[in-house]
From Swiss-Prot:
Keywords: Amidation, Cleavage on pair of basic residues, Disulfide bond, Secreted, Signal, Toxin. Residues 23-48 form a propeptide. Expressed by the venom duct. Pfam families: Chi-conotoxin (PF16981). GO terms for molecular function: toxin activity. This is Conotoxin Ca5.2. The cysteine framework is V (CC-CC). The modification Phenylalanine amide is found at F62. It is found in: Secreted.
Length: 66
């Protein structure tokens, strides 16, 4: 009988958890994700190149040091 309240609480938590999209990733999805990641990394390098000569702390933020 002591387990019933715990069981009900866990059941409520499971029911209120956000659902996960179990759809498998297609080739187009994977390619789009790869392109987004590449764009993000290139933008980070461009930003580092712009600010590093002016601000050494900026270089440290972008993972580059003088």
């Amino acid at each position: 009988m002591r387990c019933v309240p715990v069981f009900l609480i866990l059941l409520g938590l499971i029911a209120s958890a956000p659902s996960v999209d179990a759809r498998p990733q297609t080739k187009d999805d994977a390619l789009a994700s790869f392109h987004d990641s590449a764009k993000r990394h290139l933008q980070r390098l461009v930003n580092a190149r712009k600010c590093c000569p002016e601000s050494p702390p900026c270089c440290h933020y972008f993972g580059r040091r003088k």
